[in-house]
Amino acid sequence: MFRTAVMMAASLALTGAVVAHAYYLKHQFYPTVVYLTKSSPSMAVLYIQAFVLVFLLGKVMGKVFFGQLRAAEMEHLLERSWYAVTETCLAFTVFRDDFSPRFVALFTLLLFLKCFHWLAEDRVDFMERSPNISWLFHCRIVSLMFLLGILDFLFVSHAYHSILTRGASVQLVFGFEYAILMTMVLTIFIKYVLHSVDLQSENPWDNKAVYMLYTELFTGFIKVLLYMAFMTIMIKVHTFPLFAIRPMYLAMRQFKKAVTDAIMSRRAIRNMNTLYPDATPEELQAMDNVCIICREEMVTGAKRLPCNHIFHTSCLRSWFQRQQTCPTCRMDVLRASLPAQSPPPPEPADQGPPPAPHPPPLLPQPPNFPQGLLPPFPPGMFPLWPPMGPFPPVPPPPSSGEAVAPPSTSAAALSRPSGAATTTAAGTSATAASATASGPGSGSAPEAGPAPGFPFPPPWMGMPLPPPFAFPPMPVPPAGFAGLTPEELRALEGHERQHLEARLQSLRNIHTLLDAAMLQINQYLTVLASLGPPRPATSVNSTEETATTVVAAASSTSIPSSEATTPTPGASPPAPEMERPPAPESVGTEEMPEDGEPDAAELRRRRLQKLESPVAH
């Protein structure tokens, strides 16, 4: 207040000094006025004095029509005033040819009236939050709206007649500006009427938010039309109105928001009426039955949102007109709402009792696998690998002090079985061979068997895999829903809390299956990376001896499996001459596998033949 008084006194002193100086030079009234209008410093001082007078007039009118302004109203006024002053300066650059004291006075008057329109809008919006409205408040607002409406209409009429008589000029800008201010006065008046009707009723008016929403939609559409017409005319007649870009953008954004709010509110209210269940008395008693929107107790007519918060139906309807979220947790009710269930088609009256619904399919029980085996991989994970059984351990190569078993016996013990009985026999033979190799007197440690939980080695590796670590079992894949009827699927879908929890649990199960599959793959790759390349076979004899050994090993596979005997524990004497394999020329060639490469068992048998060849010769 003190700064305002100092500024007013300084402006008044400067104005008096300038006028006295001009009169001292000219000594007459008319020459003094001419001198003041032609002198730029004198005009600057007079402009400052005019602004001070306008400021004082605004203070007086504010006291008359508003009384004491609130802090929020002053903040909004200053924020909008800065933008208005910037737009006015841009308008001065567009109409620099028409720049004159009259032009400045018209823009100052326009800014002055805009300030009162903004204050009237804020004060009417305050009616909704104020519990007590006095008659003085009504008299002030009604008289202010009446005065602003008359002034806006007069300035629009003046601009219209000026354009008709003098052509397109700066009055085109003022005409459209005052027309937009008239739409603002119309919006303020409708809101005032709605708030007044709501204050007169004891209970809250449910339809007030609907009328306010459609009022903003209607007035926003009018503003958009006015700005589009103004931009089109200004571009054709004068130039591009740069100062009108920001208010036009704000008007279009406000109109778009009004349209979106109207659509979303209708959708939210429709969902509330169709999807949200009514709150039962038990639910109201089990929780705090005070509606946080109106702060009144809920007895009847309450709705429960998908987030399990309960409110009055009328309060929710008014709330959804403004925003489509839960008043408590801010959950988007449009995204959380599920589509309504389609009612089942009516059944004919002459039909018998409906058949019993099919029971939901039970999840398959996990099969029992032998110790150290994994369940098979899900179908489609490794399509090129056929299912394989447990791979038998390989007996270690005999040391120098131990006897060498006949090739036919080793081949029969290491050959892959084809049936269950053969599998048992082969496993027993391999176990006996391992026990013989690791018995007392052996000079080498036993080789590691297959990895527990990993039933097969890589197809290109000849040595058994070391046990890396224990693998967790593969989870059982979930069952499908192909056998369910549409009615059962609708019943399983559901819209309650337990159905949502079931869906979340299914997603967690899928996540667990994916994690288990990736874990198995990573463990398999880790085992492969930890193993080195296969050791090359040592060349003991010449090329002729190697070929003879290979043919002899091939002939040993033609001996029936019934003639194969299991070696006994302990060291055995060298094989006699009659037990040696037949000559190579009397043996046919062995059939190779389909892929043209010998398998792991064949490679191991050949190595045993190479180690045995010095003893044979």
Curated annotation (Swiss-Prot):
Ranges of the Lumenal topological domain: 26-41, 120-140, 191-224
UniProt-annotated stretches for the region Interaction with p53/TP53: 236-270
Gene3D superfamilies linked: Zinc/RING finger domain, C3HC4 (zinc finger)
EC number from the UniProt entry: 2.3.2.27
Class of this enzyme: transferase
Reaction(s) catalysed (UniProt annotation): S-ubiquitinyl-[E2 ubiquitin-conjugating enzyme]-L-cysteine + [acceptor protein]-L-lysine = [E2 ubiquitin-conjugating enzyme]-L-cysteine + N(6)-ubiquitinyl-[acceptor protein]-L-lysine
Feature: compositional bias, Low complexity: 417-451, 537-569
Primary residence: endoplasmic reticulum
Ligand binding (Zn(2+) 2): C307, H309, C326, C329
Molecular functions per Gene Ontology: ATPase binding; DNA-binding transcription factor binding; protein-folding chaperone binding; ubiquitin protein ligase activity; ubiquitin-specific protease binding; unfolded protein binding; zinc ion binding
Transmembrane portions of the chain: 5-25, 42-62, 99-119, 141-161, 170-190, 225-245
Tissue expression summary: Ubiquitously expressed, with highest levels in liver and kidney (at protein level). Up-regulated in synovial tissues from patients with rheumatoid arthritis (at protein level).
Residue intervals on the Cytoplasmic side: 1-4, 63-98, 162-169, 246-617
HAF-H domain: region residues: 480-535
Location of region: Disordered: 337-375, 393-453, 535-617
Induction and repression of expression: By endoplasmic reticulum stress-inducing agents such as thapsigargin, tunicamycin or brefeldin A, but not by heat shock.
Location of Phosphoserine modifications: S613
Post-translational modification (record): Not N-glycosylated. Auto-ubiquitinated. Deubiquitinated by USP19.
Cell location: Endoplasmic reticulum membrane
Subunit organization: Homodimer. Interacts with p53/TP53. Interacts with HTT. Component of the HRD1 complex, which comprises at least SYNV1/HRD1, DERL1/2, FAM8A1, HERPUD1/HERP, OS9, SEL1L and UBE2J1. FAM8A1 is stabilized by interaction with SYNV1, which prevents its proteasomal degradation. OS9 and UBE2J1 recruitment to the complex may be mediated by SEL1L. SYNV1 assembles with SEL1L and FAM8A1 through its transmembrane domains, but interaction with its cytoplasmic domain is required to confer stability to FAM8A1 and enhance recruitment of HERPUD1.
Domain observations: The RING-type zinc finger is required for E3 ligase activity.
Family to which this protein belongs: Belongs to the HRD1 family.
Identification of the protein by name: E3 ubiquitin-protein ligase synoviolin
Lineage, broadest ranks: Eukaryota, Metazoa, Chordata, Craniata, Vertebrata
Gene this chain is encoded by: SYVN1
